[in-house]
């Protein structure tokens, strides 16, 4: 009996120790625009501390195995830096990926450029997220993107599966509007943090949520076993994208999806499937982003 209890205790300890955090992020900071040589040590410190914070923080109650962690990248370009105040003006390019079933291919799930990734940072500043008492815009933005990455990843596996975590991102938005930085408030910019999340959760854009699920789970994940059926499912998902665009033509969300998925979609249909399928894919993508006509011409061949 004692041996059995010992084994159970050992198993529980192993399970707890084998649980991993949700994100596996790579942070890169580019500072070529900054001539001040004093900054390099600070920038290197910021890069390491940000990466450790994102990867070591437990963002949700979810239990992930190491191999299930979500790959993501935070590429930060410093445009301005005040060494006296510690104020940074930077641009963030964030993207997350997930593996496609039965393949070695990773697909981009969510990618966004944030031109207002501005914050104050001094070496030694605490890096911890306290939802009810956060005063750091840097920490708020990282928390927002962490929840967005997790939420959008869940959306790709089940219909509206990321709702809880997208609402957590929404909570960050609501609590950060008094921090005094751009990106959190409505009407500043339709592509800002508030605008993209608000539009995505808007019932009028429900087609986007159908798209995220059907494109990935019903489409890409079956591409190896049944390419024709998978392409048909992806086209059906793109019809939902078209519906979302028609419902809110001024929303940036449908166009954002086409920007980071365009090349992948072209590769899926170019020279494959039926001519009717290729023509329909062309029409959908062109209607959302007419400036991409030259790139879309591959679908016509």
Please give the residue ranges for each predicted region.
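Flexible, glycine-rich surface segments
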Residues: 158-250
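A cross-kingdom marker for long, charged
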Residues: 28, 213-301
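Bacterial Sec-dependent N-terminal signal peptides
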Residues: 1-23
